[in-house]
Amino acid sequence: MDTLTAIGRWLAKQHVVTWCVHHEGELWCANAFYLFDAQNVALYLLTDDKTRHAQMSGACASVAGTVNGQPKTVARIRGVQFKGEIRRLEGQESDAARKAYLRRFPVARGLPAPVWEIRLDEIKFTDNTLGFGKKLHWLRDSRAQQA
């Protein structure tokens, strides 16, 4: 199994992302439920335009963040660190992402918040189930690396 497939399978089983945005010397982090899109290597989430992180992001911004599980033992620790770009989706792109998101999280049907995409450009996946401290790396430009 290649690196991106392994990372993608794990990301598809999780549901909460933390991301941080930087704007005019200020940092802010946020959490949200997400849907992983393996084809585009992206996370889709809903967040209101009035939130601090959305206002700091504007139409598009660089972000860094994490996705991690909550295992009971160190030997089962798995988690992702990433950097990428967040942008607010519009039109058909937004409609398609919202439809997929609502299939995964039907409770969000009444939420009018816009859909945002975090395009993952670099991923470091720590997977202790493969050996303590085992890391898999993926870069959008090179498509896959392993360390």
From Swiss-Prot:
Domain of life: Bacteria
InterPro entries attached to this UniProt entry: Split_barrel_FMN-bd, UPF0306
Coiled coil spans: none
Family the entry assigns: Belongs to the UPF0306 family.
HAMAP family assigned: UPF0306
Protein name: UPF0306 protein YhbP
Organism of provenance: Salmonella paratyphi A (strain AKU_12601)
Gene: yhbP
